[in-house]
Swiss-Prot record:
The keyword Transferase does not apply. One of its GO terms (biological process) is proteolysis. PROSITE patterns: MPN, UPF0758. One of its GO terms (molecular function) is metal ion binding. This is UPF0758 protein CA_C1241. NCBIfam families: PRK00024.1, radc. SUPFAM superfamilies: RuvA domain 2-like (SSF47781). A motif (JAMM motif) lies at residues 178-191. It holds the Pfam family UPF0758_N. The keyword Membrane does not apply. Zn(2+) binds at residues 178, 180, 191. Residues 107-229 form the MPN domain.
Length: 229
């Protein structure tokens, strides 16, 4: 079956978004042109530039279209399953990038907020990673560091590796976060032993250990909330 959808390559060279991006840089392209590069093809009666422009207009702009559900996207004329999935993937990447880039100046007031801050990164790893969230006196995030990779045990996780950067950053407190690749956040005996050891060290160092959060597959356990810290 012949694909009659109008493609970017069907447009004149000076109107093709990809060529314009390569020649002038991505910053000069409009939102509709950038979306056209992602979606690639138009419909039988509408080229991709016009389609992208209409999608943005009918959805209330870039923020609007990136927050639509699959069902809502499918209601927009010209969007089928493939284009809806492409837009959903683009929106999710944008959300993850925004969360990753904007963690600084975030104030942590609950274990849930701390877990949400690192959930997407930690749940994607197939090995255990130990993150240290460093906070100032107002519980605002200074930095997040990945200090250990591999199964958590006392021979690998040394207090020196955990506390050296918080000391250099003048952190007032820290929150430990690590993942269980199995998806089950239930703490192991080793998790509890390491937490106890690091908590005792925090008393001498003067940097308070507020919590140890274990990340599973979209779920978490706070040792503080469980009364284990």
């Amino acid at each position: 079956m012949i694909n009659n959808s109008l493609k970017i390559t069907d447009l004149p060279n000076n109107e093709r978004p990809r060529e314009r991006l390569l020649r002038y840089g991505s910053e000069v392209l409009s939102n509709s042109e950038l979306l056209a590069i992602i979606l690639r093809t138009g419909t039988l009666h509408e080229n991709i530039i016009n389609l992208s422009s209409r999608i943005l207009k009918e959805s209330g702009g870039l923020n609007g279209v990136l927050n639509l559900s699959f069902e809502e996207l499918k209601k927009v004329k010209g969007i089928g399953n493939a284009k809806a999935v492409q837009i959903l993937a683009l929106g999710e990447l944008f959300k993850r990038f925004k969360a990753y880039k904007s963690f600084e100046s975030v104030k942590i007031t609950s274990p849930k907020e701390a877990a949400n801050l690192v959930m997407e990164q930690l749940r994607s790893f197939n090995k255990e990673h130990l993150y240290v969230i460093m906070l100032n006196t107002k519980n605002i995030v200074i930095k997040i560091s990945d200090v250990s990779v591999g199964s958590l045990n006392s021979s690998i996780v040394h207090p020196r590796e955990v506390y050296v950067e918080p000391i250099l950053k003048h952190a007032a407190s820290i929150i430990l976060c690590h993942n269980h690749p199995s998806g089950d956040p239930k703490p192991s005996n080793e998790d509890l032993n390491i937490t106890k050891r690091l908590y005792e060290c925090s008393k001498f160092i003067g940097i308070e250990l507020l919590d140890h959060i274990i990340i599973g597959d979209g779920i978490y356990i706070s040792l503080k909330e469980e009364g284990l810290l």
